[in-house]
């Protein structure tokens, strides 16, 4: 193996702004397969760490793959430090996790990482399920999120169903959802962005609610009827990018929502079942 060693000058190492930890598909536009190109469109460097590697989402007639083994997963994280690729790291974002043990491994890595990066932004999308489908991850994942990742996160982006699971509270109206979100806030967890909150069905609107200790901001967007998958992953990619580019939280959330709508409409125009990213106009 030593005879193959070519690259040992760590001063030449590529540097990441963001490490994105979530699913990856060979075919399609979910998880890091949509998040990475979206983040790169924003001019940021991102390293993708897969939690599951799948042929495609389960919404097709064939489906292959599964969770990354713990040994591989921990090795992927460790290798980023061994390559000295995290000197300029600014954020870690997480999405779909394959197993509870991955969540524990990730939390241990993040805890160690924060010693060298005390200002690191950790944003967790606690992917658990939704109102229509119920829980679609392994049953021990919600508790793993509560125990290991939520205490480390500065911000989280649950949907209404996930907020209910994490808090044990009914969140089917706006006031109860806000109260549940506020119950999660702590010295570390500064904000909760509730995605897919109740909106005005008659006016074809959906709401995203930004909850902090000091404020609540309800952002309404047009509702697009579609079965497209990966919109939540795209939203989080745009949100973390906006925050790192200096946007205030409410502005970053608003812009992320607008970008998701733009991508959905563009995809529909091109008659695709998988998200297609149009060029990003500078704002």
Curated annotation (Swiss-Prot):
Residues that hold ATP according to the record: 125, 157, 162, 195, 221-224, 231
PANTHER family linked: PYRIDOXAL KINASE, PYRIDOXINE_PYRIDOXAL_PYRIDOXAMINE KINASE
Assembly behavior: Homodimer.
Protein name as catalogued: Pyridoxine/pyridoxal/pyridoxamine kinase
Origin organism lineage: Bacteria, Pseudomonadati, Pseudomonadota, Gammaproteobacteria, Enterobacterales
Listed GO CC annotations: cytosol
Pathway this chain belongs to: Cofactor metabolism; pyridoxal 5'-phosphate salvage; pyridoxal 5'-phosphate from pyridoxal: step 1/1; Cofactor metabolism; pyridoxal 5'-phosphate salvage; pyridoxine 5'-phosphate from pyridoxine: step 1/1; Cofactor metabolism; pyridoxal 5'-phosphate salvage; pyridoxamine 5'-phosphate from pyridoxamine: step 1/1
Keyword check for Metal-binding: yes
Residues given in the record as Mg(2+) binding sites: 136, 162
Enzyme class: transferase
Positions with a binding annotation for substrate: 23, 59, 233
EC assignment: 2.7.1.35
Keywords: ATP-binding, Kinase, Magnesium, Metal-binding, Nucleotide-binding, Transferase, Zinc
GO terms of molecular function: ATP binding; hydroxymethylpyrimidine kinase activity; magnesium ion binding; pyridoxal kinase activity; zinc ion binding
GO BP: any one term: pyridoxal 5'-phosphate salvage
UniProt similarity note: Belongs to the pyridoxine kinase family. PdxK subfamily.
Cofactor(s) the protein requires to work: Mg(2+)
Function in brief: B6-vitamer kinase involved in the salvage pathway of pyridoxal 5'-phosphate (PLP). Catalyzes the phosphorylation of pyridoxine (PN), pyridoxal (PL), and pyridoxamine (PM), forming their respective 5'-phosphorylated esters, i.e. PNP, PLP and PMP.
């Amino acid at each position: 193996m030593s005879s193959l060693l070519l690259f040992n000058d760590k001063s030449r190492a590529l540097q990441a702004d963001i490490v994105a930890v979530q699913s990856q598909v060979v075919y399609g536009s979910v998880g890091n397969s949509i998040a990475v190109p979206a983040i790169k469109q924003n001019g940021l460097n991102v390293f993708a760490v897969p939690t599951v590697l799948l042929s495609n989402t389960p919404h097709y007639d064939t489906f292959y793959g599964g969770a990354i083994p713990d040994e591989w997963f921990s090795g992927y994280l460790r290798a980023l430090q061994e390559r000295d690729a995290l000197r300029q790291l600014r954020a870690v974002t997480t999405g779909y996790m394959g197993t509870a043990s991955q969540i524990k491994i990730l939390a241990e890595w993040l805890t160690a990482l924060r010693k060298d990066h005390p200002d690191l932004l950790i944003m967790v999308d606690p992917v658990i399920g939704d109102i229509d489908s119920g829980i679609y991850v392994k049953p021990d994942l919600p508790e793993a999120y509560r125990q290991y990742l939520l205490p480390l996160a500065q911000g989280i982006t649950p949907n209404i169903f996930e907020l209910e699971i994490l808090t044990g509270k009914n969140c089917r109206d706006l006031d109860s959802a806000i109260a549940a979100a506020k119950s999660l806030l702590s010295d570390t967890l500064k904000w909760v962005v509730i995605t897919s909150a109740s909106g005005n069905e008659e006016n074809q609107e959906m709401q995203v609610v930004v909850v902090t200790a000091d404020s609540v901001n309800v952002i309404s967007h047009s509702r697009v009827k579609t079965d497209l998958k990966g919109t939540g992953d795209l939203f989080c990619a745009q949100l973390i990018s906006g925050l790192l580019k200096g946007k205030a939280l409410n502005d970053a959330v608003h812009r992320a929502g607008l970008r998701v709508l733009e991508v959905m409409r563009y995809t529909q125009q091109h008659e695709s079942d998988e998200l297609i990213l149009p060029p990003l106009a500078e704002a």
